[in-house]
């Protein structure tokens, strides 16, 4: 899975928040699930402007169908008309069709200028089926009528501004990714345009069946791990597998352990600030539980989503360099294993700027997580954890691509120290993890760094069930923007919180994790980078359960201090951020 660093840094560097009084409005990132990405669209009937009756299934022979909401009166729609005309002409040969939908009842669309099918949706049927909210909004359907992208065409035009050319081509990038068999890096944005009131037409509801609804929920939220070759203990890619595991699915979803996401939910009426939020939407959760409690209808196989292809090669493309641990590590069948630490030399005689990185275990099924540190040549890497990691791997998240102008520095002569946590699964095996790097073509404008807010001097008393430890960086001497947060503790970790303190003493919570789970070393990646003014402070607080109420506690009778193994503890609040690079062009 590719992390969306490119999208987050470039596509939304100039957006405004919902609370911003600035009247200018550019596309903003949305959570795909909340935007309806991954949902099945029923086979809605329509009559086009030429008087020809049709259905959405008329486009099933197309690889992709763009459903573009537009009209002839909205200024933004007028500006985007040439782009849509080019789109339907240039992408037709690639198997992409375009359906134009005009939701404005009083509009006179006769001179619209498009060659594709054009529907004047006066009764709001199509508008209701898609839930369109703007005249400039586009939807991309695959051949199974699954929404794969929803949002803006690009960011050239918005409310109160116009650019000479787009900075980010959201729609074209999504189409390119989808035709290449990839999930779009950005699959949902807002679409500034002329606002649409909710359609008075009642949307045609798809029957609650496995093929029409549940299969997509599982595919979108569980498929990355619960598939053949995935890290999960069982697959969920067929009806029979889902039915066979229905009790476990219900239990883990009800408890909030699946899908794995442990940030506190946003306040009512607010949206999650994290681009990789894995929380099930309320509608997905409701439908999943309703189906599990019913006779679990399978439905029509014609309504099934397309099978998802998972890449077997490098997600970052061909690396410029690969580094692999020298010898395979034997992973036993039972019990637990301590962290394995292995260093690999790089031997570069100059600093390297890394624009993309990917960590690839050869036995993913037993790898809990990997942290890679860049340490001085020949060093044992003592204390490296507190300095910040270079790259990371957790199941479902193993690669990171930065956009042009952003990169991490790999100091000359560094060793790459792999810290690998294995979880035996009943079968003995071996692993020989490696990392691939893609180098920037020139010194970047911005350097991406990782640091840790830490307090290594803590002592957790025996039996303490809610021991609090606080670490801080009281004064940050430069301006920065935070990309992601990554709390790290071991099996006694209970909860965590990040706060930013401004010069005037105001404290803002950046992330709260009320139930930390060592089994999932998650990064929390912001949809929009968080500005950190010079002079601000960062506070990281962690709570620990060293009592017998913690079933993962190896020994409640022991006082616990900092240490590298899971029976020790750590207190690390990793922060990924970027700053201007000295001497960059």
Question: Over which residues does each language-model region extend?
Answer:
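Aromatic-flanked redox-active Cys/Sec active sites in thiol-based oxidoreductases
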Residues: 68-74, 103, 218-220, 227
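His-enriched metal-coordination microenvironments in redox/metal-binding proteins
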Residues: 133, 313-585
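A short beta-strand-turn-helix
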Residues: 44-65, 203-212
């Amino acid at each position: 899975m590719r992390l969306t660093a490119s999208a987050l840094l470039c596509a939304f560097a100039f957006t405004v928040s919902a609370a911003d009084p600035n009247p200018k409005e550019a596309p903003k990132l949305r959570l795909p699930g909340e935007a309806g990405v991954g949902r099945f669209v029923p086979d809605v009937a329509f009559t086009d402007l030429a008087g020809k009756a049709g259905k959405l299934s008329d486009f099933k022979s197309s690889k992709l169908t763009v459903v573009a909401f537009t009209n002839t009166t909205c200024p933004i729609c007028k500006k985007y008309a040439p782009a849509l005309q080019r789109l339907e002409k240039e992408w037709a040969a690639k198997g992409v069709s375009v359906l134009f939908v005009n939701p404005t009842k009083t509009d006179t669309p006769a001179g619209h200028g498009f060659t594709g099918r054009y529907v004047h949706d006066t009764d709001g049927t199509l508008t209701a089926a898609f839930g369109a909210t703007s005249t400039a909004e586009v939807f991309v359907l695959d051949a199974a009528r699954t929404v794969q992208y929803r949002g803006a065409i690009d960011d050239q035009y918005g409310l109160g501004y116009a650019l000479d050319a787009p900075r980010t081509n959201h729609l074209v990038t999504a189409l390119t990714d989808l035709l290449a068999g990839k999930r779009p890096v950005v699959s949902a944005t807002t679409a500034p345009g002329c606002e649409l009131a909710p359609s008075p037409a009642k949307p045609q509801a798809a029957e609650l069946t496995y093929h029409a609804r549940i299969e997509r929920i599982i595919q979108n939220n569980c498929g990355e791990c619960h598939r053949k070759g995935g890290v999960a203990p069982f697959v969920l890619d067929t009806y029979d597998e889902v039915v066979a595991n229905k009790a476990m699915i219900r239990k883990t979803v009800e408890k909030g352990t699946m899908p794995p996401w442990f940030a506190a939910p946003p306040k009512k009426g607010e949206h999650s600030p994290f681009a990789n939020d894995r929380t099930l939407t309320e509608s997905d959760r409701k439908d999943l539980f309703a189906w599990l409690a019913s006779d679990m209808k399978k439905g029509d196989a014609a309504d099934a989503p397309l099978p998802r292809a998972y890449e077997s090669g490098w997600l970052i493309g061909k690396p410029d360099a690969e580094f692999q641990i020298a010898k395979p590590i034997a992973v036993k069948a039972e019990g637990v294993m301590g962290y394995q630490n292995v260093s690999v030399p790089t031997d570069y005689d100059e600093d390297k700027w890394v624009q993309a990185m990917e960590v690839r275990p050869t036995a993913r099924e037993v790898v809990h997580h990997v942290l890679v540190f860049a340490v001085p040549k020949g060093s044992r890497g003592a204390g490296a954890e507190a300095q910040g990691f270079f790259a990371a791997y957790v199941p479902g998240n193993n690669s990171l691509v930065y956009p042009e102008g952003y990169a991490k520095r790999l100091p000359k002569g560094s060793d790459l120290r792999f810290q690998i946590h294995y979880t035996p699964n009943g079968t003995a095996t071996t692993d020989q993890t490696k990392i691939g790097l893609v180098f920037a073509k020139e010194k970047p404008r911005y350097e991406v760094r990782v640091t840790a807010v830490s307090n290594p001097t803590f002592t957790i008393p025996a039996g303490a069930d809610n021991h609090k430890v606080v670490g801080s960086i009281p004064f940050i001497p430069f301006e920065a923007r935070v990309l992601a947060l990554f709390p790290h503790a071991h099996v006694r970790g209970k909860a965590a919180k990040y706060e930013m303190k401004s010069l005037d003493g105001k404290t803002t919570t950046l992330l709260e994790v009320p139930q930390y789970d060592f089994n999932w070393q998650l990064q929390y990646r912001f949809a929009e980078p968080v500005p950190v003014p010079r002079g601000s402070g960062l506070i990281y607080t962690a709570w620990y359960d060293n009592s017998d109420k913690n079933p993962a506690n190896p020994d409640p009778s022991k006082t616990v201090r900092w240490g590298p193994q899971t029976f020790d503890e750590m207190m690390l609040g990793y922060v990924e951020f970027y700053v201007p690079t000295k001497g960059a062009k």
